[in-house]
Amino acid sequence: MTLVIAGERSGAGKTTVTIALLAYLIRRGLNVQSFKVGPDYIDPMFHAFVTGRPCRNLDPVLTSESYVKKCFSRHIQDVDCALVEGVMGLFDGVSQKKEEGRRKKEEGRGNKEEEQNYSISFASTAHVAYLLNLPVLFVIDCSRLSGSVAAIAHGFRSFNPNLNFAGLVLNRVASDRHLELLTDALKPLNLPILGVLRRDEAVTIPDRHLGLILWLRSPTVFVLLTQILISRVWC
């Protein structure tokens, strides 16, 4: 299994979901390699704490597109699963670049509408997902949403049809009634809801203006990991 964990913005819950999935897979006895889009070093510390192996950064700005491909290919050779945590919002990068066209065009199939080009931000999570041909697990912070969740999901999925959306994770869901409103709104999109994280301050990683608090300085992370390991986070 290989997945990119993306979100609609910073703070949506990408790291929490990534840690939850890593812990779940490790608990099942699988060998898992984690990756992080960009040069960030704090999130990889969380990953390594859970997996027991170094997280690898995928940064086409400081390296190159070819290096990103090579790095990913090299470090998934001896593992069962690979998870790539994205950066910021799905389409947030440093500049715009033009894709060569839909994969359907590359495969010699599809109509003209399907063969059009789409812009993508260089070094964004979307760029790396497209570069590595990986499906996207999309995390949405639902703490202040109900029906509007469908507009967000539809907008991100349709913005660049080249990306393969595997499904959604609904984060910070307040109650069963809240979940019902969200799922009812999302039904017409036929996007699988693959995970739900309930609102719980005990499983929130504190952050600061420069990113997440270092795990060595944050006892909250130990509460988070404990909750994950007893399956309170992932459902």
Describe each region flagged by the PLM.
Residues 2-97, 114-131, 140-163, 176-180:
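ATP-dependent carboxylate-amine ligase catalytic core
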Residues 136-139, 194-196:
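Short hydrophobic alpha-helical runs that function as membrane-insertion/retention elements
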Residues 138-141, 169-171:
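Conserved beta-strand segments of the P-loop GTPase G domain that flank and frequently precede/overlap
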Residues 96-119, 231-234:
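Short, basic, low-complexity termini and linkers enriched in Ser/Thr/Gly/Pro
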Residues 146-235:
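Internal gly/pro-rich beta-alpha loop/helix module
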